[in-house]
Structures are given as structure tokens and as C-alpha cells.
Amino acid sequence: TPTPTRAHHRERTSRDPRTVSRSHAPTDKHGKPPKKGKGSKKAKVGLSIFCVLLALIIILVGCATGVLGKITYNAHKENEYVTASNLKSDPRVKNVLLLGVDARPKDKASASRSDTMMLISVDSVHHTIKMTSFLRDIWVYIPCKDMSQRLNAACQYGGYSGVVDTIEYNFGVKIDNYVVADFEMFQVLVDAIGGVEVKVTKAEAKEVTGHPKRYGNVKLEAGKHNLTGKQALAYCRIRKIDTDFVRTKRQRTVMNAIIKKMKSSNPFTLYKMASNAAPYIETDMTKSKLCSFVAKAGNCATSTHQARVPFPDTWWYDTINGNSVIAINKEENKKQLIDFIYNKTSEQLDKEEAAAAKN
């Protein structure tokens, strides 16, 4: 466990994620251990991850069109709760935390909870990009508040830097910078490229049009239509009529439609897209660091791999202080995360992913 630079006098119990282990695993109402998470299925791709990936595209276009000045830049803050020597780092591996939020608050003192936390590791050693998603319901210690809570609460208590501090403290990896994107950016981007063509089913149109409060007074009609940004966002958020798997399929449909539209867009449209969407992105990287990060990522983009925290067989559902959470074996997750980011080659990960796909 990293050594805190500020003393914490609160007594630690088996509920504290810094000390929880298999021997402290909770039991269900029948006195039996709950099922451990297998994690064999891919983590669901939420709308906020969708927006985060779009933010990367905007930064890429922004570097080429000179509109990065419209991005909000914050001063970089070092973690005061853990010393750098206790964090795993390598100058040849760049770690940037991407945060997806429902809306960025105008009052910087009170950030909203982060819906998505994805660590992008550009590994110049093994020439690959490694993406690690952190589930928001993981029960962790939040150092800025000196308390344990769900991981996504770290943003509310400590802002974007608070999320970085919390992940570093609990999982022992150095995070160099963060990038934040919100849902408003998605709408602006779609409108900037003139909308996206999507085929809407009768059930989807009925769900959105019939629930104005849920979808912001948006109207959809069945059939193939060119959707505005607001309509496309409502379409991506549909979830009541089917499963999460179908919802993520809708999101991929829109994502592909956006990429297709961008490929056929002229330079002026791409400039307009980047210029309009850039104000909805926030980071603690300078312009030069942003462009450097994009350049390094481009050199490694031929190989990409994904992981999720918690890793398979390292977690279980629990109820703590009335909260339904994901309890984890923290030391095992820390070990596997460091191994994934810094040690594993692309060939090793290809074999692991192929084996997992067969199970």
C-alpha cells in the first residue's frame, strides 16, 4: 500500500479497501459467500465512454487545425496523499485519465460524479495503447475526504484531480494527466457535421417521443432520418425498451455514423466541428503536451488492448453502510494493473484475449 504523506488516524477495519482480503469476504443472507465476479464478458460501453472517445478525436483534429486554445486548461496538481516513489511509473509509458461526466459544473468547487473513468496508457516500450476502464461502483479509499466510498464519488469530493489522487492512492500507478468531456460536446459535434443518418425503429421512436421529460422533449420518427445532436443523444440514451447490449449497439451505430460523416467532410467542416466541440473539453495538459500525447498515441495506434478494474476473480458484490457496491481484492488488482500497463507485450495480450474469447 502506498505510504501516505499525511497521517490518517482513523481506525482501519476489514471494510477499509486498504485492508480487505479474501478472508474478509462478505456473506449473503444465507450465510454463504456471494459469487465472485468472473469478468468474462466485456465491460458495457456507456455513453460517457462514447463521449470520451469523441474527445480524443476532437483533440486529434484540434492539433491539426489550431483550435486547442478553446479547450479549458487547468493547473496540474501533484498528489499530496502519496509520494511519487510509491507509484509505479516509466518515462516511456504515458498515462492519461479520461473522464466522462454528464455535465461540467460552472462552479469548479463542486464537480459532478464521474460516469466514466478510462486510463489510456501509451506504451512506447511495447508499441501499443492499453485502455483500462475503472468501474464506478468500486469501493475505495478517497484520500481527500479521509473516507471510503464508491470510486465515482471522488470527483464530487475532490474534483478531477481528486479522481486522479484516488486511483493513484489505491492502485499504485502514476497518472500523468487527465482529460474531461461531457455530454453537451456530443450534441455540438453532431450538429457541427450536419447531423448523422440513423435508422430508427417504431419502438425507439415511441419511447423517445412518448417520454418528453426523460429525453428532453425530443421527437423521433420511425425510419431512416438525419438526426440532430439532441435527437442523436436521446437515441443513444434509450434503455427502457430492451437491454444494455442493444443500447450499446445503438451507441456504436451513432459512433460509426459520425466517423463516416467525418471521413467525407471537407476541411472547413472538420475545423468547425473541432472549434465548436473544443470548449466542452477540459484538461490539465498544456497545448504542447496534448499534441505530444496525440503524436505518441498515433505511433502506437496499430495495436490496442483493453482491461477492466476490477480484474476477473478479484471482486464481489457487497452492501456497505447501506450502499450496494463492488468490493475488491485491492492488492491483486494493483498487481494485475501494473502488470498490464508496464510489463505485458502486445503478443502476450493477444494470446490472453484469444483464450478469453473461447471461454
Residue ranges of predicted features:
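Non-catalytic, solvent-exposed segments at the cell envelope interface
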Residues: 2-359
